Amino acid sequence: MLYELNHAFDLAARDDSVKVLILAANGPHFSSGHDLSDRSGIQDFQAVGNWGGFEKPGAEGRQAVEEEIYLGLCWRWRNLPKPTIAEVQGKVIAGGLMLIWVCDLIVASEDATFSDPVVAFGVNGVEYFAHAWEFGFRKAKEILFTGGSISAREALSCGMVNHVVPKNDLSVFTDSLAQKISKRPSMGLRLAKQSVNQSQDAQGFWSALQSAMSLQQLGHANNEIVHGIAVD
């Protein structure tokens, strides 16, 4: 699914008739997190990064895969040249956070909740480790330490979410927001997005993501030594 989503993002980014992208999900919940099924089909897709070594054994192969399909793809999506809006409802768990965090704006329904419980698996959190930037430092620690969730209203108060609306109004509100943005000059939007992203990068965002990814790989390696499996 990640490569299919990447293909859709690429098509939209290159289509001049597309002004704003909306990432939405069908059903009562936005995302239950990572698909932990077999990744052996990764070689069927065109890699976006240059890590290679996907078939190598042990930590080397696992890091290559996760640098590609998680951190690599998320970083591409975060830097798309057009405005992106995540439209979320219900539960947003673990990998679901990575999908919405790469978007420029987040509109949530009143029933939305957000969590990353993967410390329970013996690692630090999801691979696109933007927790401190999205939740704030102390709230990020609480969420990771406890495995708990925060509500849409709490996410709004800490600046992670832009708007909270009734569930029945979610799509209409998001479409209206996208329409409003689409009327702005595309060059101005592109430059505004790039400027804000670069301000974040100047504060060390990309370095923090890379460091957290390395620590996550340490957690996986420890699990393999202690428990015989990468995820405890």
PLM segments and residue spans:
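Terminal peptide-recognition signature
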Residues: 4-5, 23, 35, 83, ...
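Glycine- (often His-adjacent) and acidic-residue-rich active-site loop
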Residues: 25-72
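Glycine-rich, phosphate-binding/catalytic loops in enzymes
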Residues: 2-4, 37-41, 125
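Catalytic-core regions built around general acid/base machinery
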Residues: 4, 8, 69-81
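C-terminal alpha-helix plus adjacent terminal tail
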Residues: 30, 42, 147-152, 172, ...
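Conserved CoA-thioester-binding segment of acyl-CoA-metabolizing enzymes
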Residues: 1-28
